[in-house]
Every structure is written in structure tokens, then in C-alpha cells.
């Protein structure tokens, strides 16, 4: 079987990671002790992708949990599925990274990284044919962003031909923990551009807006945001965990989704959107799902896809439904909105259907888009970065850990290059100039 080793780093990474394991364990019929109580062969057919089978028929997640302080990992361990993880796979320091990327990447994190790699190596060795790694982390803090990107580059060094996939939570002023988030995020993106094969941008701004506007939650908690993240992560990994044809492994997904190596930042979406504890039981139709899934309001990245064009799209439908109807609806979307799909990649929308719906829903749809509109997210971070960096605000926290200002300048220009590359492919051979007036102004800015 083609196995995936999962890593989670930092507070955010461990919280969404723990939630991910709760959701997929439930979908595969695995209880908190690792025992199987399922009702369908489909649940076990590809169980080896994410789980090791241990003695006594117990299933153990191929997960490595990393943090620079013990707090979050203690709560994961005492949480609902805390006992399912292999105890040796908790690797933590005591000092904390204090939301400082340099501490995670160069000082504190660098001291812990070798013990993490030992655990990763052990997990990789127990694999029959490792396809790659996935990391859950945030880009705003110190550990997930600094040490997370350090782990990525170390794993890249040791396993250069394996796919590296990240679920990266992008900071937002609306849900902010620290003032230095733009620094940490920019330094991280600088690493992700070079060292990952696919990155799902999960944007706190979008999650917050969904909770607030769509789900009508007046004060969204991290629990509410994480509920959305886990639904999305469960959706985008469906093809990897259940038998099927399309995008059945990380490499095939990358081949379908990434036309240019640097442009691998995906915008995930999910339909129907439900709040925690109130899954609606109203029956959805395939046309409704399709329409919702392409709607800007359902995107987990705060970018409007109508401001850009899709290079590629993958859609995953879950539940019992007619394949024919799904194909018709997907074609319908493309024909009606053809100007939003680049014409120089024909057949750039791929669809998969899985019979098993997520818990509490009859059917659902997950969207993975590689859209040039994702540049809005990088622009947003870049503007915040520049505002502080111009005044060298808070810089001493980073230089004190041995960083150089030059590194900030490089990261800033790499992220700005990324924005220009997205813009370049958005404008490529576009006859219909009308829609791209915004585009030209940004080029000159």
C-alpha cells in the first residue's frame, strides 16, 4: 500500500491534526483505542495509507506530533482520541518558540529537529511503499511556521523523491494571536514555495467569515474554525483513503493540479457548510452542491475566485449519487463560466466520487482549486509585512536569534515574485481584456 506519514507541528497544527484524526478514525470505523468497529469493507480497503496495523488488530495512526512546549500535546493526549497515537511519537521541547519564527527555525526548533527525524525515519521504515508526507501547521506562530518549515526542508533532504503536502493555516488580522504574524507567514511562504509539492491554504480570515456570515455564529471559537478545517481535510484526503480512480495518491494529485512547480498553493472549498453539532439533514441535490462548492463564500481561503482564473480544479463528491449527474453539473459550471478557467489547459477540471459520505451528511462536495486569485492572500500578508518591516518593528526578536535582515528582504521579494507569477498566468493569452483591468494596475504598482 502507498502510505502517508502525517506530521503536526505547533499548537494550531496539533489541534487541527488531532481533529483530523478524530474525523477520519470515525469514517474508517476506528474507536479511540484503535479497534475497528466498522460496517463496510471500503473502510479497511486502504486503511494502511494512514494507519499502521499493530498487534491485536489495533490500528495506530502514522502520525508524528511535534511542539516546542508540552501544553498542547498534553491536551491532545487527554483528548477524545489521545490514546490512539503511539506514545513514542510525541516529540516536544520545554522552552516554547514564543511566536518567533527564528526560534522555531534556527534555535529551539533546530535542537529538537533530530529527535523528530528519528521518529519520522522509524515511521517511514515501517512503510511498504511510502508515497509522501503531510504536515498540518500554522504560518503565524513560531513552532508550526519556523520548525514546521525546518522539518519540511530536512525531510526533503532525506526523501527527495517523496511528495510533500502541507495544510497551512494562514494568519488573518480578524483572528490574530500575535502582532508578528506577517513576519512569520512571509518567512514560511518563502520556504513553502521552494520545498513543498502541494499546499492547501487554509485561511483563518475565510474560516471566520464562514462562521460569522454563513453559519451565523456571533463569536466563533477556534473549535468552530477547526470543525471547518477537519471537514475540509477529510474531504481532500477522501481519494487517498478510499478506493477510487482519480487522484488516488499524492503524486497523481500533484500531476493534475500543479502546472508550474512554484504555483502549488490550493484554495480548498466545502459544501454544504454546517456548524458544529447542527449538521442539517435537509437533502441536497447535486446541482446545489456544485453551485455551492464553486461559490466564493464556500472557499477556505479569503480570495474571490472571480478575481482570477482557475489553472486547475479537482472536485470530490461524497455520498450516493448519479455519476452522470455529477459530470453534467461540472461541465455545466465550466461552460457557463468558461472565462474563469484558463483556455490553455484543456480538461483542467477533474471529478471524483466516493460512496461514503462524511458523518451526519447524505452527500457533500470538496473543492480543490489552483486559482490565480490566491495572490490576494499573499498580497494581504505582504502589505502587512511591509508596513512593519519598513520601520524595522519587532525585528530585534529575530536578529537576536541570529537572523539577518537580508533574509527578510529575500522572503519578501520571493513572495512578491510569486504574486507576479500568478498574475502573469492569469493574463496569459486572455483575449477578453475587460475582466482584467485590475490586473494591469497591479503590474505597475
Curated annotation (Swiss-Prot):
A motif (MREI motif) lies at residues 1-4. The keyword Phosphoprotein does not apply. GO terms for biological process: microtubule cytoskeleton organization; mitotic cell cycle. Preferential expression in germ cells. Gene3D superfamilies: Helix hairpin bin (1.10.287.600), Tubulin/FtsZ, C-terminal domain (3.30.1330.20), Tubulin/FtsZ, GTPase domain (3.40.50.1440). One of its GO terms (cellular component) is cytoplasm. Its cofactor is Mg(2+). PROSITE patterns: TUBULIN (PS00227), TUBULIN_B_AUTOREG (PS00228). The modification 5-glutamyl polyglutamate is found at residue 438. GO terms for molecular function: GTP binding; GTPase activity; metal ion binding; structural constituent of cytoskeleton. Its main location: cytoplasm. Keywords: Cytoplasm, Cytoskeleton, GTP-binding, Isopeptide bond, Magnesium, Metal-binding, Microtubule, Nucleotide-binding. It is found in: Cytoplasm, Cytoskeleton. GTP binds at residues 11, 69, 138, 142-144, 204, 226. Tubulin is the major constituent of microtubules, a cylinder consisting of laterally associated linear protofilaments composed of alpha- and beta-tubulin heterodimers. Microtubules grow by the addition of GTP-tubulin dimers to the microtubule end, where a stabilizing cap forms. Below the cap, tubulin dimers are in GDP-bound state, owing to GTPase activity of alpha-tubulin. The MREI motif is common among all beta-tubulin isoforms and may be critical for tubulin autoregulation. Belongs to the tubulin family. Dimer of alpha and beta chains. A typical microtubule is a hollow water-filled tube with an outer diameter of 25 nm and an inner diameter of 15 nM. Alpha-beta heterodimers associate head-to-tail to form protofilaments running lengthwise along the microtubule wall with the beta-tubulin subunit facing the microtubule plus end conferring a structural polarity. Microtubules usually have 13 protofilaments but different protofilament numbers can be found in some organisms and specialized cells. This is Tubulin beta-4 chain. It comes from Xenopus laevis (African clawed frog). The gene is tubb4.
